[in-house]
């Protein structure tokens, strides 16, 4: 007999790992070294080391994989609990992606922005949640910009992160995404 494979548990495990790596990357960016990883690093490596993954490029590549998975989890969440847990994982991964300091991570995020609408175009509910997800991303970028103004930065940031975390960029983009979310709700 054929069994259908339940991929929820691997998805949950991946999102949990990505969320933890992202939160650790975020607090590392602001100068908190929970596990003493920075003690034996050379001065030249201090600005490029993030989370348990080490190199910022590897960390950024990992989060480029986690970013669409987190968006997909919230798009397909069924029930309030699943939606809230997916949203929490998504916000963690968004913060982690912002501190990656890798231009390749930024390109991966832009690829997600292009590919997801093409795949989801025929599903109005999924498109609506995608718009909400991008709205949350830009609000996360805005909050990151606020935090960056008052907390010390210990790692490098990509040009993309510096630009998108400015209020003049993040707030209009968040408002546009939320407006699209409302419009898609009225159309559906």
Q: In which residue ranges do the predicted regions lie?
A:
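Alpha-helical transmembrane segments of multi-pass inner-membrane proteins
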Residues: 1, 5-188
């Amino acid at each position: 007999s054929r069994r259908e494979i339940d991929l929820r548990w691997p998805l949950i495990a991946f999102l949990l790992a990505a969320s933890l790596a992202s939160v650790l990357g975020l607090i590392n960016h602001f100068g908190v070294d929970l596990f003493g990883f920075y003690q034996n690093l050379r001065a030249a490596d201090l600005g490029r080391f993030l989370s348990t993954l080490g190199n910022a490029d590897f960390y950024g590549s990992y989060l480029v994989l986690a970013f669409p998975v987190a968006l997909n989890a919230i798009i397909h969440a069924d029930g309030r609990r699943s939606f809230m847990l997916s949203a929490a994982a998504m916000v963690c991964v968004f913060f982690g992606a912002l501190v990656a300091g890798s231009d390749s991570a930024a390109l991966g995020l832009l690829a997600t922005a292009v590919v997801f609408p093409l795949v989801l175009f025929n599903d109005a509910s999924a498109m609506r949640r995608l718009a909400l997800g991008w709205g949350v991303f830009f609000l996360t970028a805005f909050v990151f910009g606020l935090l960056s103004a008052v907390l010390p930065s210990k790692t490098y940031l990509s040009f993309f992160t510096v630009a998108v975390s400015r209020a003049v960029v993040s707030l209009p983009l968040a408002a546009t995404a939320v407006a699209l979310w409302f419009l898609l709700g009225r159309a559906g």
